[in-house]
Amino acid sequence: MDLTTLLADPNARTILHERARALAGRDRSADVATGELTLRFTLGDEQYALPATAAREVLRFETVAPLPAVHPAILGLVNVRGRLLACLDLRPLLGLPATKPHPAMRLLIVSAAGIEAALLVEQVLSIQPEPITLHLTPAAVAGHSASWVRGVDDRLALHLDPEGLLCDPRLTATE
């Protein structure tokens, strides 16, 4: 069967369009070059990064006031100079094993989309000014956090979108 005959058949054309849409939605493997400053931090043995413009400050972890009936990623509230901020542990959202907070950890204060929060991290590594190339991750690799994972760089750091992260519906206290 030649292509003209195949495209003339409405059923075949529908199947081809459905397959093309499925393939287009599945592959996010293109590379994107970015020249923004990135802040690198660790969670466990893994490196992560986000745009440095979203970072406000880095503080020592002291205490957190737990909240009842919230997602495991919401540890509770921290007091930052009189402001109460949600303290978030990204491990449950990224499929990493839970870790009990300890004094050697840091709070990375981030702001995006009008929301400010404290991310619990092992350590802040650096702010890097050089251009990077992000390799977009397939949705299957990014898992359920795919909406706020921008890609992975050549050093295998997963780059996060702070706006998508802070607007994730799982991080909204509803009760």
Indicate residue ranges for each PLM-predicted region.
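An acidic, low-aromatic, low-complexity terminal/linker signal
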Residues: 1-175
